[in-house]
Amino acid sequence: MEIAANLLRLSNEWIVAQVDEVEGETLPGDPDCILRQPFMVDYEGNLSQWPKNSDDREVVVRSTDITTIVSPSKDLLANYIKSLE
């Protein structure tokens, strides 16, 4: 299974998710990124569903709230894919 995921810093949390842009025009300040299947990553690399207390598997956020976006390590990506199954 080929999955393109990103590791991003959002609200002082590390999140691994599939990131897409919102289609169509958006106004400044409007959410413009979709995080699909987001999981929070703790310091040991364990994953937990994000956001907590929600069953939503797609979360729309503002790209301006993302402070860092990088590719996840191979181990983290493998753990993420396993969590999706």
Residue ranges and their predicted role:
Residues M1-E85:
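Conserved RNA-binding domains used in RNP assembly and mRNA/RNA metabolism
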